[in-house]
Regions:
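Short basic helix-loop element that most often maps to the first helix and adjoining turn
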Residues: 4-23
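Key DNA-contact positions within bacterial/archaeal DNA-binding proteins
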Residues: 18, 28-29, 57
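Recognition helix of helix-turn-helix/homeodomain-like DNA-binding domains
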Residues: 25-40
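DNA major-groove recognition helix of helix-turn-helix/homeodomain DNA-binding modules
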Residues: 42-60
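Short hydrophobic/aromatic patches at helix-to-coil boundaries
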Residues: 62-65
């Protein structure tokens, strides 16, 4: 399981898991799994990045892979 900076980034934006999930159109369970280091699809990463106000090219700021 790889680590990522999703939880740290989300919390710094004062955003709940539920709010991020709603904005990214994914389930809160998906957000939890990703924050715990589980892998996810590229499309899910894209949705999360956009919900955080980032561009797909900024994926290195959140995800290691």
């Amino acid at each position: 399981m790889g680590k990522n900076r999703l939880k740290e980034t989300r919390e710094s934006m004062l955003m709940s898991k539920t709010e991020l999930a709603r904005q990214a159109n994914v389930s809160p369970i998906t957000v939890s799994r990703i924050e715990n280091g589980m892998p996810c699809r590229m499309e899910t990463k894209r949705k999360i990045l956009l919900a955080l106000g980032l561009q797909p090219a900024d994926k290195h700021k959140i995800f290691k892979d």
